[in-house]
Amino acid sequence: MKMVMAIIKPFKLEEVRDALSEKGVQGLTVTEVKGYGRQKGHTELYRGAEYIVDFLPKVKIEIVVSDEDLDKAVESIQNAAKTGRIGDGKIFVTNLEQVVRIRTGEDGEKAL
């Protein structure tokens, strides 16, 4: 099993969710986050004063998939989140030792 975490632009969330759903990926966790990378920040004017906005709003999604479903999940996220501009985000994949469904006690891939 794999944990897939992606940091994407907020306006791409619905497209990513729909793309994952089409591939049979059920359930994801969404967290609003802020960050910066190559995109860096920008300057804004507020009441005549300049402010540097270093951290930009992003969305972090987390899904757990079987090893067999990993490639299609990553590809779905990448294709749906891509705009071709700096700041599109990143996808991280890690091994997952164990999953337990709290309600039933099922574990492993049965809990997905």
For every predicted segment, state its role.
Residues M1-L112:
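Positively charged, small/polar-rich N-terminal and surface patches that mediate targeting and assembly
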